[in-house]
Amino acid sequence: MPPTIVLIRHAQAFHNVAHKFSHPPLTEKGEGQCSLLRENLLETFSNAVENPEDVAIIVSPMRRTLQTAMLSLDWLVERGVKIEGNADWQENSAKPSDTGSPISSVSPDFPKVNMSNVDALWPDKTSPAAERYAYSKKSILARGRRALEDLHKRPEKLIFVVSHSGFLRLGVVGYWFFNGDYRVFDFEAERGDEGELRVKQQDKTLSGGLGLSLTDPVALGHDLPEEDPEVDPSAKE
């Protein structure tokens, strides 16, 4: 049986306050949001976690998502739940605030996160080799499908994913996420017209698990560029 998935947006980071930041960490407010998120997740899911092998945590290898994961899901890690980085869950654009740092510079600060399977292309998003991570409608929609396929194949019953608003909204599920809020989804039995996996949100998180997020859905791929406007086309030749 496919897992239930808990999709979490990272808490407030410095780029949410002022945009000119490279790979920004959480703000003090963001750390406070993690405390509220942790309390809610612990109350909601603690009894559902009997066997740590039935649970997994997947996290974008960005500093703000790693911090959010370790501050809000530490109680799962302490119970033996595995936590691993995955480049498919990174944010959409190639701006400095949405581009990560080399794993070698990040992993020492997060020793409990398994980074061994992070794509060797990380943090590249603009070279021809890294087209799968490009800021384009085609690449982001394909990445969203790939990310869901990977979750669907996993053996765990419950998977927490800490990711980013833009990717979750436009590439994966079509809903807005407030900083430090989450939504819970189950896989549908039937696939879409193009063979894509479909997920259905649980009613209890229609406004977010903390009640902070908008209820109106958004079309996947809405307003995403056909090509990354910040990348020189000649670089792909």
Predicted regions and their residues:
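Acidic, low-complexity terminal tails and accessory targeting/binding regions
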Residues: 1-5, 93-112, 169-237
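Phosphate-handling substructures
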Residues: 15, 20-25, 72-145, 214-233
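Generic beta-sheet signal
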Residues: 5, 55, 157-163
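Active-site metal-binding loops of divalent metal-dependent hydrolases
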Residues: 11, 164-165
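Active-site-proximal alpha-helix that buttresses catalytic centers in soluble enzyme cores
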Residues: 2-84, 181
